[in-house]
């Protein structure tokens, strides 16, 4: 199915889930809309208050994504999808957290993890047992297991595999056609 790891968590939990999406940019917002259209309650986190305000008003913050201007308004007005700048408002009690924070690469093609590290720390500080954390940003091989699993455990005090599940399921979509790609490409 198109929801991948979210479907796995849903099967364990029941039909409707509370999903937090961290990073409401050109990939994160369409993913959040996709989950909300699937019947889930979604809270998005973004550091940009302007983006958060526009999403909550049902206004597309960055034009160009096919169908986003059509799908977003009814989800925002119904409360199925909302956004916040506060991790404490989105993460506690979430069944799944989807990390879609950009990973910047410097001029020598080295990844700069500072933004993702900060987002992971902020998310982990509010993580509750039973949550699935899925990294969907494209990351170097081994980063989820070697960098983010230990960081989540350190900050949250929770143990991966016992208290929380941490997975890597990179997005396979392109901006401008996210909804079509989600329907077209299966996810693990």
Predicted feature descriptions by range:
Residues 105-172:
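Rossmann-like NAD(P)(H) cofactor-binding subdomain of soluble oxidoreductases
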Residues 92-93, 129, 184:
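Alpha-helix C-terminal capping/helix-to-coil transition sites in glycosyltransferase folds
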Residues 6-60:
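NAD(P)+-binding Rossmann beta1-loop-alpha1 motif at the extreme N-terminus of oxidoreductases
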Residues 62-77, 155-165:
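Short mixed-charge
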Residues 93, 99-101, 136-137:
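Short, well-ordered coil/turn residues at beta-beta hairpins
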Residues 67-95, 105:
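A structured beta-alpha segment of the ubiquitous adenosine-cofactor-binding alpha/beta core
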Residues 99, 165, 172-188:
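Dinucleotide-binding Rossmann-like beta1-alpha1 core, especially the glycine-rich loop
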């Amino acid at each position: 199915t198109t929801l991948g790891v979210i479907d796995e968590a849903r099967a364990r939990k029941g039909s409707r889930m509370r999903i937090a999406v961290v990073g409401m940019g050109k990939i994160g917002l369409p993913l959040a809309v996709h989950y909300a259209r699937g019947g889930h309650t979604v809270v998005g986190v973004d550091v940009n208050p302007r983006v958060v305000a526009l999403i909550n008003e049902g206004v597309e913050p960055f034009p160009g994504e096919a169908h986003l201007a059509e799908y977003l308004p009814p989800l925002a007005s119904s409360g199925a999808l909302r956004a916040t700048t506060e991790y404490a408002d989105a993460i506690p009690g979430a069944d799944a957290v989807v990390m879609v924070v950009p990973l910047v690469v410097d001029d020598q093609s080295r990844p700069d993890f500072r933004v993702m590290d900060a987002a992971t720390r902020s998310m982990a500080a509010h993580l509750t047992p039973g949550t699935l954390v899925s990294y969907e940003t494209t990351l170097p091989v081994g980063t989820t297991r070697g960098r983010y699993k230990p960081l989540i455990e350190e900050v949250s005090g929770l143990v991966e595999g016992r208290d929380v599940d941490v997975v890597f399921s990179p997005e396979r979509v392109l901006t401008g056609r996210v909804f079509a790609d989600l329907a077209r490409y299966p996810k693990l």
